[in-house]
Amino acid sequence: MSTTSDLAQEPGYFTKYKNFALTRSASGVLTLRFHTSGGPHTFDGTAHHDFPRLLEDIAFDSGNRILVLTGTGDSFIANIDGPSLGDITKPMGADVLYVEGRRGVQRLADLEIPIIAAVNGPVSVHSEYALLADVVIASDTTVFSDLPHLAFGIAPGDGLFVVWEEVLGLNRARHLEITQGSFTAQEALSWGAVAEVVPLGQVLPRAQELAGQMTRRPHLTNKYMAVVFRQRISRRLAEGTLAGMALESLTAANLAYPQQG
């Protein structure tokens, strides 16, 4: 059983991962902030490698009662460093993305604590991380999109489309993906994909306020409420990414042979 003093201690994994800043309140609200060198986050090979490992650390730390996900500055995750992900046209490179990609989104979905996303601006890379949260609070400057997949020439099989399909609806998700469209926080609110839209400066404080309120409930209530809330999306991701990541890898391999279409 964790005590208040235990919760106030900083576990070693808090400083283990270069792209993720972690802080935790005395009541067990863990805030995970994506960043790159202290500024807005550019998703890269290191983050891809570390994210599933960080989530495993979070899952096994009983001091974590609520997770708040957020970005740095005026964007959640708006950029990606493609070359740092390795040569995805080769089997071993694709396998790394397959293993890490599946584990990252699945471990997030299977985390047995409530998740609140504090979306602090544009999210054009891995928006599924935010949208599968139990509560999504977005700034009025937020725009959601999927930058990498079709721009790179690969099928969106890594879980993003599964989450979009669940929270946006199948036909809307397909249209947005095909057209490489985007949608604002207000549109997401009207579609039911976002719970609250607030000014940028209020996003994280509002998320942490809500998280603090939730910690007043019994821990087991919060824990198993999260399991209940995400059991459907967890099943969908387990099924969808198993074949989806393989098909994404196939389209990535095809990039080495442009003459074949």
Which residue ranges define each predicted feature?
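C-terminal alpha-helix plus adjacent terminal tail
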Residues: 1-30, 36, 73-77, 83-84, ...
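Hydrophobic/aromatic residues within transmembrane alpha-helices
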Residues: 32, 69, 129-131, 188, ...
